[in-house]
């Protein structure tokens, strides 16, 4: 048991993390994007079938993302905003997963998904050094836009793992995988959604945000129906969030980026445990 109390990562990794957080904040300060803090413990959570939340005393949830609360701030008149801090997801542990991790999420007023991809690429170039990013439509990656969602998810994950070195924006996700993104106005078969993959690691997920409250409610209800049919817990819909969307979400694009994974790539590490002091096994 000797040394069982020791942190998982090196002191160099702690210094690199501090430097990265400083770099991220300077990036947004230079663009006059406001840093905000929202609640990590809230009364509601996401319905996404692929995400499991951590419940606290059966009545509250540790947040899987600040998305709903950030969008409520935007509906209340906030300018372009970002949040940098911890989020939580149940059942996620491994080389690239931890139940608690650091997420950078930001929203840019007046941006669409294409404009936001350019800004994401700027940030990544700043952190990792300049390198071209290839645009890769989902149909080109997977070979189809139609079929069972679970089958498509597996095919996509397998294709991403085989991409190899390099930076890729996967774009034009099928409409059934739109999540909270708008559908593409020129081609409603696909969503205005993108994911950034670097050296086979998924780093960021972004949308041209959907603000239609009725459509969002329908998507949430579809999620819940799928959850019930597969034996998963179905949370109550977040009516405060939906009321904010009814009041009006300004035209914007948003993206969530995994800071720990970005740091892992920057340091040439092979797992999150090398860049987190206390991952789940030693926390």
Write out the residue ranges for each language-model feature:
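A translation/RNA-centric and nucleic-acid-associated enzymatic feature enriched
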Residues: 4, 23, 39-73, 82-109, ...
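Hydrophobic face of alpha-helices
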Residues: 21, 25, 117-124, 217, ...
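A conserved active-site cap/scaffold subdomain adjacent to cofactor or substrate pockets
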Residues: 96-147
